A protein has these predicted regions:
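A short, basic N-terminal segment
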Residues: 1-58, 372-373, 383
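C-terminal leucine-rich, beta-strand-based interaction scaffolds used for sensing/assembly
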Residues: 2, 11-17, 21, 25, ...
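Short, Lys/Arg-enriched N-terminal segment that forms or immediately precedes the first helix
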Residues: 30-32, 291-306
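Short, conserved phosphate/pyrophosphate- and ester-handling motifs at nucleotide-, phospho-/glycolipid
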Residues: 41, 69, 264, 370
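P-loop NTPase nucleotide-binding core
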Residues: 54-66, 70-161, 344
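Conserved Walker B catalytic segment
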Residues: 140-202, 209-211
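Helix-loop-helix "sensor" segment of P-loop NTPases
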Residues: 206-259
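Amphipathic alpha-helical "lid/sensor" segments that cap RecA-like P-loop NTPase cores
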Residues: 243-299
Length: 383
């Protein structure tokens, strides 16, 4: 997820004072950067590093705000000690091949050692230029060829390297071309390992469940799933965070936060920051957490709905917010559309919502786990 909390701080009077001196705090709102900053993800961190050591590509799956970005950034510290460089590529909002190229360029510009190694080859690539600020991308007549040349330069010159594509489902519009490109990298440059994060739909689903005709058939990444915290782990997280900040808080207040924020690390962090850093009283901190969380969630849901049947998807989500069975969801869609949807339309919407990890299904009952999404839908803040 890439509507970063730090971006939201831009609306506050003095955002830096809330972060000053807290680079290692559990309640720092930026993605964690070091293994020691992670909480409750030791097993997943070890597994991720083990996969890279064995040169296995990895897909990190999980709902929004669960800590996927923090996990890969913390892993990078361990990987660098092993002599493996990492290029972090933020794909949130990237459109098409040019969007991917620009995102890759931004990632390369933070890894100067790799940039210097590939400069000789990349500088001769169409659409690629170097300046004082590093590498930049201009419009290319053959952007996928430019991408292949750039990745090829990394494969030939950078040594052991991990390329992290965060929110890979953003590239669904170029799935066909990208699958061929990834297959070529897999076959040609075994020193280049891809780590992919996102939800199980679009390009990610195609990568993890390739058909026999897919270029990636037989090359599927290993899956690493990040679960929300249990109630016990959520309580432990908050207690440790408040201890770090020397902030007193009651058992009852922690229990209420755990109950309302439902194990999502991002929301627990936001609540802790509101109490320990902004010094808001518990009740006000809960209100601010829910208000800010629903704004972030609304932005992300609007992004997901782009290019989709908004009426159908919102009808399904709204009825699932109070839990519903398939027939009830179909009836809600029919009411909102004022026409009878066919079964395939309903099923397709539900499958996409499950793949995007917006809804859960258990024994035929559809529910929404994320408390911010439930609040957003039940309070009619999105129509």
């Amino acid at each position: 997820m890439h509507v970063l909390f730090s971006d939201r701080f831009k609306t506050r009077e003095d955002p830096l004072k809330y972060l000053r001196g807290l680079s290692l705090s559990l309640f720092n709102l930026n993605p964690k950067e070091f293994p020691r900053e992670l909480f409750g993800r030791e097993k997943e961190l070890d597994e991720l590093v083990r996969f890279v050591k064995s040169r296995r590509w990895i897909a990190i799956l999980g709902p929004r705000m669960v800590g996927k970005t923090s996990l890969i950034k913390a892993a990078n510290v361990r990987l660098e000690k092993m002599g493996v460089k990492a290029i972090y590529v933020n794909l949130w909002g990237a459109k098409g091949t040019h969007g991917l190229l620009n995102a890759l360029a931004q990632g390369l510009n933070t890894e100067n050692s790799i940039l210097q190694k590939i400069k000789g080859i990349a500088d001769r690539t169409e659409g690629v230029s170097f300046g004082p600020g590093g590498i930049s991308i201009s419009l290319s007549k053959r952007p996928m060829t430019t991408m292949w040349d750039l990745l090829g330069a990394i494969g030939k010159q950078a040594g052991d390297c991990v390329i992290e594509l965060d929110e890979v489902q953003e590239l669904s519009t170029i799935s066909g071309h990208l699958l061929k490109l990834l297959a070529n990298i897999f076959n040609t440059h075994p020193n280049v390992i891809f780590i992919l994060t996102g939800s199980m739909f679009g390009l990610m689903k195609t990568l993890l469940e390739p058909r026999s005709t897919s270029p990636m058939y037989g090359r599927s990444p290993a899956k690493l799933y990040l679960e929300p915290f249990t109630k016990e782990k959520s309580s432990e997280f908050l207690k440790k965070g408040f201890q770090e900040c020397h902030e007193a808080i009651t058992k009852e207040q922690i229990e209420e936060a755990v109950e309302k924020l439902d194990g999502i690390p991002g929301w627990l962090t936001l609540y802790g920051n509101n109490v320990a850093i902004r010094k808001l009283p518990h009740k006000k901190a809960m209100e601010e957490t829910i208000s800010e969380g629903t704004k972030i969630t609304k932005d992300e849901l609007e992004h997901f709905l782009q290019g989709r049947d908004r009426t159908t998807y919102l009808a399904a989500l709204k009825v699932a917010a109070t839990s519903a069975r398939w027939k009830e969801i179909k009836a809600a869609i029919e009411t909102r559309r004022t026409s009878v949807p066919n079964d395939a339309t309903v099923q397709n919407a539900l499958e996409n919502l499950k793949a995007a990890m917006l809804i859960n299904e258990k024994e035929g009952v559809y529910t929404i786990k994320d408390p911010m999404l439930r609040t957003l839908l039940l309070t009619s803040q999105i129509t």
